[in-house]
């Protein structure tokens, strides 16, 4: 049985976490994690292609109070900076200012140098997002199996590398679900 990162289990609940683990979402080996990352990347590539067919202002629209498409990409920049940069690499380079934290972590925006009220253009956010996504793929390439069990001690806790990678894969998967749902609504609401 695959070991799922404890914060994910807490967020999803044990039954849902086990169900998703059974679908290969929470691999605990490099090959499985890299495969899940590639699958997420393919899903996002298709969805971003759909998004690029919309006027940029539509990608800044919120649906039912959820983040806009561009805000979701900004959040995924934050996710990568947190789990890969801060946790796995224990980087001191900091966060990209366009990263968007979840509401429960908004108190840390200032100390992390995040400009949550910024309104960068979609293509600028997409370029940063694509660079972060490529960086995750590079990290997966250079890790070896023993690295997965390394304990990382960033500023806010203690995590295994495998758990941090599971968190990134899960966030990418979950936010793709939300972004796709909302993009479908925007397409329907703004069809010619």
Regions found by a protein language model. Give the residues of each.
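Short, contiguous alpha-helical
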Residues: 1-9, 34, 45, 49, ...
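Short, charged, surface-exposed hinge/linker loops at domain edges
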Residues: 1-27
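Terminal low-complexity, poorly structured segments
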Residues: 16, 133-139, 161, 179
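Acidic/histidine-rich alpha-helical segments that form the ligand environment
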Residues: 23-51, 106-147
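Serine/threonine-rich low-complexity intrinsically disordered regions
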Residues: 13-16, 28-29, 55, 101, ...
């Amino acid at each position: 049985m695959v070991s799922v990162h404890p914060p994910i289990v807490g967020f999803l609940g044990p039954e849902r976490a086990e169900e998703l683990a059974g679908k290969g979402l929470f691999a605990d080996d490099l090959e499985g994690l890299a495969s899940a990352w590639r699958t997420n990347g393919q899903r996002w590539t298709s969805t971003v292609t759909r998004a690029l067919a919309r006027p940029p202002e539509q990608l800044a629209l919120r649906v039912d109070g959820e983040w806009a498409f561009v805000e979701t990409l900004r959040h995924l920049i934050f996710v990568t900076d947190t789990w890969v940069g801060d946790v796995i690499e224990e980087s001191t380079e900091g966060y990209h200012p366009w990263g968007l934290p979840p509401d429960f972590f908004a108190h840390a925006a200032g100390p992390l140098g995040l400009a949550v009220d910024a309104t960068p253009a979609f293509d600028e956010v997409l370029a940063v997002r694509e660079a972060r996504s490529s960086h995750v793929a590079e990290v997966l390439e250079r890790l070896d199996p023993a690295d997965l069990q390394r304990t990382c001690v960033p500023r806010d806790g203690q995590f295994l590398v495998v758990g941090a990678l599971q968190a990134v894969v899960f966030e990418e998967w979950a936010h793709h679900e939300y972004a796709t749902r909302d993009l479908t609504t925007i397409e329907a609401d703004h069809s010619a």
